[in-house]
UniProtKB/Swiss-Prot annotation:
Family classification: Belongs to the class-I aminoacyl-tRNA synthetase family. Glutamate--tRNA ligase type 1 subfamily.
Stored SUPFAM superfamilies: An anticodon-binding domain of class I aminoacyl-tRNA synthetases, Nucleotidylyl transferase
Localization annotation: Cytoplasm
Protein name (database record): Glutamate--tRNA ligase
Organism: Onion yellows phytoplasma (strain OY-M)
Chief location of this protein within or outside the cell: cytoplasm
Amino acid sequence: MKKIKVRYAPSPTGFLHIGNARTALFNYLFAKQNQGEFIIRIEDTDFSRNVEGGEASQLKNLRWLGIDWSEGPDIQGPFGPYRQSERLAIYQKYAQKLLDQDLAYKEFQEGHTTFAIRFRVPTNQTFAFDDLIRGKLTFQSQEIEDFIILKSNGYPSYNFAVVIDDHLMQISHIFRGEEHITNTPKQIMIYQAFQWHLPQFAHMTLILNENKKKLSKRDANIMQFIEQYEKLGYLPQALFNFLSLLGFSPLSQTEILSPQELINLFDVARLNKAPAMFDKTKLDYLNNQHLRKLLPEVIASFILQKKYLALTTAPTNYKEWMTKFVALFQDRMHYMQQITDFYQLFFQSTPFLSQEATHFLQTNPQTTLILKTFYNVFDVIVFEKDVIANSIKQVTTQNDFAKKTLFMALRIGTTCKMHGPSIALLLELLGKKQVLKNLSYVLEQAQKF
């Protein structure tokens, strides 16, 4: 059996787009699942679209996602070069072979000596192939006019170069977007003209936006580049997980899957024909689930490295403080930069009460006494989580306050919020000075009623 070998062949037009990342990922999953090879080739012959640094950016983001390759422009290999701009002599050689067999012809521009080369489309022929996702697809040659394979500047057309490269690089399977379906009959013609064996094609479903329209780079409300997610602190394994599910339904009881689990589960028979929906809420959920699996100190190290939280005065033992802070909010975190939102929510220097909190103070006359009690207790204790928790327990058991009222008054009084995470650890991180300041402010407001 021929060894399975697939490729991802981007143009260096900028950052790695989520659609292209999905294409790379499906090729990678298929190769790994079948102990095959995954390679990278750069299609850079359209210089007007190339962006400086685009190639390096794409490769960096693929590696960040957890995708590796055995051949490519950065590591070379036995079938290079791996940039189309460095393979022009190869394309010209094969174009000449078609000219020699009268399977192509020169087309001169009027008044010029330069010419393009067009492929002669066979007349009255049917071209069919078995798509691994969509089944048998058929095209008639009369629907296609003679097409350019080599431009007058000596550069190949996409459909010509891709066939030459895929054959010479021994590509066995091609996973790509459904927009390439119409290119396939032209490519089949070229394969047949050279009497080369066809690779197997799999045309993946479209990715739709929330309005069920094809995802476009003009969709400003959707972040569309992998680098944007990396900068916000999404985990690569979570993006890997999310992108893998855009058009693939694994045979699994859970959608929260590691890269290795997705490799093991990947099955072409379970690739969908129906369009996939880009659901940001689902991505946030998956990232949250992957974040929950990490130790707080791992997330804390990343947050410190990325400098998401730029504090004017950092707490003593900042990494230890950050680890505790992460532990407090880890279950609520959709991405790591969100730590700044949690900090701003609770660690504000100027206390402020919401309308809801103010209403609670107005309608619960016990609040003032509860707040005074906690102020007096917190003023004299060592401000550590276990000591704080024990002090709260003592106030609860030694006084006749209604429990629900007591705990709500405690949370409002110490944090100026109606809701929040574990109170004892939160108060330790806020620090005694801020907690007493909050209590004084809320007491002052409560005494007005």
